[in-house]
């Protein structure tokens, strides 16, 4: 296994036909490449307890959630993962959110879904390209 510092976390969701990125204010965090046969990564985020309801709603949906993380340095390009919330733990005034998932190629999977949603909303041409780039 390889362990790295988690320096940035964004949750990417579709809300009211729009793709929304929510920046999560990290207190601390780790990201672990489990190097298993399934190419699984563990993302552990320590955040303020005021995020509890936000993460509970996501967890209760029992759906996969796309996230972007910055690994080791805030200046690094974000890596995109498809994850699910494994657990949420109370730690004093904070919560520890454990996500399990797989790193994805930005040209595939959920990104294609995001592009399809934009096309369905009527975006086309340069406006589509601009909107799509703003989401990446």
List each language-model region with its residue ranges.
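N-terminal "first-domain core" detector
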Residues: 1-38
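Mixed-charge, glycine-accented linear interaction segment located at domain edges/termini
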Residues: 103-136
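Intrinsically disordered, low-complexity acidic/polar segments
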Residues: 52-54, 76, 92, 106-110
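Short, well-ordered strand-loop elements centered on a beta-strand within folded domains, enriched
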Residues: 18-23, 43, 95-102
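"Short basic amphipathic alpha-helical interaction patches in structured regions
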Residues: 57-61, 79-86, 100, 114
